[in-house]
Amino acid sequence: QFYHYLFSNEFISNMKKFSNVPINKVKIFEFMLLTKGGYQQPHIHNSGPSTVIMMLYFNKNWKKGEPGGTYITPEEDESKMIFEPYNLNNSSIIFHDGPQAGHGVRYVSKNIERRAIQIYLEEYSPETGWNVYPKNTELKEI
């Protein structure tokens, strides 16, 4: 049911209203697992003006302050972190992708599992493709 709801007009409409970003389709849906020794360097996708990224966390008994949540930073620099979720039990972080939408995950040093679902919502057009990767309609001669 959850998966079907993600691809429903109702969900897309609600997320469009919530974010005020002209999204109309789910582009990526993936399960993620991070364990001891895992991390993600701070990075910025800046894939286009119409991308919303959602991380849904399902981790019971997560200790406040433990690394594992996707932190937000305006640059590709962990020391500039402005937000990091501390409760990963049935929680979510949603952000608009852009040139200052840096994010990453601090090094996980304990024997824990961070379980998450990552969803990218984006604007799509049958004529031009995704707002990030326009459809190439011209074939190169070989």
Residue positions per predicted region:
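Signature of the catalytic double-stranded beta-helix
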Residues: 1-28
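Catalytic core of Fe(II)/2-oxoglutarate
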Residues: 32, 37-38, 45-50, 58-142
